[in-house]
């Protein structure tokens, strides 16, 4: 029975007596919520009466379930009633009405007079004036599709077809009629319309009597900027308004329409909503009461109940709802009679003010096959799933043709049906379907399905004087005007047509928006086979069609076609004979046949003729010959395309339609453009200015080549051989190609031969390689034979140059691109959206794409283009070396559009995607990189800016052949001269290529870590390699050791040949940890065997068989085993290539390798196994010790021999082996390995990655041997952890971080043992676990990764035994609990637990009985406390979670009062009543928190600080507010880590004061207001004195000079008192930046620059640097450049350059930083600081070689006196950032030249102490104290030596240094005595 009672929603409709009705009505007015209580008690009494009422009870139960089903029925028109308030969405906007989408697929309409009273008044005023008003705008400007609106059903009109039209009203007076001025509260969300514009804001009509609403301008600015596009609000504009303040006495309401405030608005109990006043669109917090298949019942605002039907569940959470679940819901409608409230859980409704996404109507009317059923809901209907994944819905009456044929079993989930989309419901985000056969087979469903010119069938509905109405479907009506009932006018149409007759019509006009359809029944038009003209673009000259005369005038006839297209037949075209009076011959409505003479679509003008042209196919032969005489060779004419053939186009020569043929090759001068034009030309297209080449009996041969047309027009067309003489240059085309030469024909028909010998300046192997048939060429006549009518021609470029090659090149390029643009125009006329989109795409356009597939050749295919089906491709080169995966989002730039293959070539290159805005100059010479190649032109990108430019690959019509060596390649560098500075319609700049000598080699995209880049060449190897040698493999040679390096030894052989011995070829058995090269000494004679050689240029190790071995550096071996070897068995292994050799190494194999260096950037050790085999040891594979991983350079020495295990080829390059020093080559169960944290998932665990390419997961049960709720907070991404592999059975490893696993030898204490299965548990065992969830059956506690226990309700807490106890508030997921195992069920794997104190020995999990009110507090009524206890419990839980997260929480801290709203700005602080003082212990806790907050702030900056301050402010609100507002204790403005000017503005972190709301919550205010009326006179006097004291205290605070600035006015006062203090100005800027007010921060900076005195140069520079920082972070590159240029003008340029370089570096804009440093090196080449900073920059980026080159350049540019300092600086940098060995070499070289530079010695000593060993440090001290220096300097070094030994040495070492100093003093004294 309890369940039955819950099923009754609020507001039932059971029958009641009149007295009972009256009683309920009075109760509702007093306390609406007592009804449910009385009903429950009544029902309980009935139950208690005993078995006598059992039968009646069953009936009641059945009725109640039926009642629930009725309530869950979806809305229909019958369930609506007048006055019902409902939420809707604007679907369509027309001039006079709005179409509103309502829930459950309903639709209503709002008339233009139902917007608001002010708008209606404006309309009436406009009608009265008969002139449009300026301040009155139409509905399309006030409303847009997708807007959510609150409506009221104003009327339900019934049409003739018994269909109801739902008429709605948006007028606030109707919508908000249920509210009164007294019920308005701050925080309420209302809707209103703008009624007028005032000086300081807007008056808003909210429709509440007795209340006036005002919207201040500042509260509307955000909305105006974001939603209104900067325009002011208009009268009638619909707004979602939040009440900010209510002034009760005058009824004035202050509103806000800010997006953040409105979207966060939520209805609360404090706002005193009732069922009568509840408005649609309100967002409420609700609790799920019951879950049914049809939907949910919710409880909200404590007392109200509501329904959520299946359409309005959250699609992502459907099926997961459970009882007592807390959700947020939106009110959809409230029925005024039944009081039923319907709600929605869809996320889109939970943010008020957010518009709904507009559904695409492309498929509207589409018939779909095999659509599967997703769910069947009985009488409500069924849902279906479409192919694209979207949901669709069909009502019950649309599931079958009739009720009799309906079969419910046919709609089981998964069954498929044929259906048709009939509409879209935006409110439900669903497509509406119908399965009715009549609808599926209907020709048209909606007006937009009907196209002008289409044939349609319909039934006569009515016959009226103005025409006949025809019905063509359920929704479609059309009109046949009286004029169109027949070919001639009929007087009595009712005699010919009858109601119900089926008629066949042709559509004249269809306007879907206006639902206007006009048709014709004229037989000639209906049965016409001629093409119909439906738009002006269809009207091609020569087209014949039917139309009807609209008007007859003196000047001719106006003929109308379809879709309001009309044209004029001039008087002289009415007939072949003169027509004196057109009105006597023609009449209106007459059907006529016309031919199009001319049409201008842009002007909508068309010229027609009744004098029909003859069809050439039907002409007689004699007439045809007669017309052909009208065309002669050399004549220009327009042609119309008739048909396409294999080789060209069949055309008709206009105006006489003479048949002709236009070959494909003759469409263009450019060979590639001919097929392109042929492909896109269509039948009916007209080509202008076509040249007639020849006229024969069969056909007329035509040509469209612009070069030939220009030659004919220019008179360069000799018609006979007598007009031709040697030396003439003629333009023709290749007619035929033979082995011996090429025949060229000219426009007049003459032809000549170009022999092979003079065909080209280049050697001609095959004539067909140089020319193709139909190609346009320029020929020079070399010989003429008039008798034989022959001539010889030359096609060589040197003979046929027409002028400047550069000009010709540009002309050819322009012509080629212009023709391609013409092709785009042809494409844009096609119906296909794909082709139209391709036509609009031009090079240089940026696209946001998604990677679809990476092909085997390295190229990439993309999806997510502008239209589906578009092929977008990036070549391997244009991947720019990026690692891509399917689904990855990328930004790309279009390079070229292939209009034949319908492909778009794009590039991901960084320089192209991030194009720079720089002004270009015409004629400037620029470097460019070739990005794309076509046959006739190339597309290149300018190096400086990234702009795309096109340049011709040919400089002449004959210039078509290139040898392979001359051909350009993608990536090759070229020099271009710009001819245009702005890209035209083609999207490309035009340019001319410079000399070919300026071309550079192709820029290959290669891996940043290749063998070539890593190869470091020993300078000793470069010397002496010029000589050839006669050595061969196996020869034994002798030599002298020249130098010793860590991994190799350089040896000088006979005849000065240099050889090399690798560390692996010195000893047979190398002890681990030793350096083999140390065995050899400089000058020692060695005997070695030649085993290979290194190339002189590349220094790569070459195999034996290499042909250039005689010019290599011999590779030697001194290993005893190889020296004793007589044969070549050992040596033959060196003949294998390195890559093949690497493949021979097997994973798990142990090798000896030699450390070359530690790569700090890539975090690996680089080692050499052999001269040609190198490897990498990732840092995580070097050791299991965290100490070693932290400082690997201290553990491993360069040149040291290491034993390593082969893992496999390196991931980044197959030229390297991946090695490991910790043993295993693959991860398996039981292994311990080092990994790196990739992700930390709260309440779940960690994800860890390994160098082996594997990934593993660590459960929260395996993080530590002792559980903690916060132990996951100790981990951050990229942190190194030691892991134990528990399982490797799946691709994702199972790991453990427990010390008992990773360090078993430590024998650490195990507080919480591992629980992997139920077998690990025993009954009575005490253990700890984490709360997983709270279920109706009890609390689920996780005991291990796969073991979960259940604590049933009686075993959870001793305070409450109810099953419905809200434990989830007190036992959140992840909470750590101690439990006792009560029972184990091994068969069902069930574990029963107890959490009770007597079982666990711990405190009760619930500190107090649930539902018990907290202790009564001062100044509060008990009622308010009880009512708000639940809300406070939530706030307390949130606060505890925040304290846990930030690490600042303390036990016993007072939770804050329930906040009404989070303030948006830190400065927004209201003064109000002061709270009661708190206890001293709470104050101490607050002080601790404040100190912690201040400490944590020092290590952070920027935006993060801003948000942290927001959190701290919330926490500080827990402190006594008296303390917070005391000015003496207000926190001061703080700067993190000192004041450094070259850091970002975000490090300036003003410690803004906490912005807690000083007034109490609304719950506290109500009782105080109630008691305020009852105060005595004495109390009022005391209150007045108290208020005066508070006011004086505030005034004192404002006068305090040390007061913390809280607003812009405060900062203005400060900068007024100290105008030249940059610190204050920067704090002012930071204040604005933290509020994201970028423009205001800029304005402050500009004020500072104007205000600060010109004498304060440093202060001004500080502001300039801050402004640069601001523009770098928030501005564009252009704005940053402008500020930088200004800063350089007003400050010392070098300082500004250096600051900007640092800004770029710190913001990781390394490319910009590099470019800036290059500019600085050119401008400040005499400044050593620039060179040193650039060197440091490169070293930090890992570019050591580049840094070395910079040092060499610095020494060339700087004066000699600076050299030593620069060298020392670079050496210092090498020690710190680069190779320590190289740094030592630089210092040693410098000190050998300048041995008395004590400053260099001092720096060298510092570096050795810091980066070297103690042995090295003592060695250098020994050297320096034996130098011959001045005694004063020697004293300095002795003192340093002594200090060093005191710190690092023993007492013996200290005494030794003292003895040496004494010895030095005695020696000096004896010398002075002598």
UniProtKB/Swiss-Prot annotation:
Modified positions (Phosphoserine) in chain numbering: 7, 438, 1362, 1479, 1496, 1501
Modification type N-acetylalanine: residues: 2
GO biological process terms, semicolon-separated: rRNA processing
Bias type Basic and acidic residues, positions: 1417-1433, 1578-1589
InterPro entries in the record: HAT (IPR003107), NA-bd_OB-fold (IPR012340), Rrp5 (IPR045209), Rrp5_S1_rpt_hs11_sc8 (IPR048058), Rrp5_S1_rpt_hs1_sc1 (IPR048059), S1_domain (IPR003029), Suf (IPR008847), TPR-like_helical_dom_sf (IPR011990)
Chief location category: nucleus
Annotated GO MF terms: RNA binding
Task performed by this protein: Essential for the generation of mature 18S rRNA, specifically necessary for cleavages at sites A0, 1 and 2 of the 47S precursor. Directly interacts with U3 snoRNA.
Complex and partners: Interacts with NF-kappa-B p50/NFKB1 and NF-kappa-B p65/RELA.
UniProt protein name: Protein RRP5 homolog
Organism of this sequence: Bos taurus
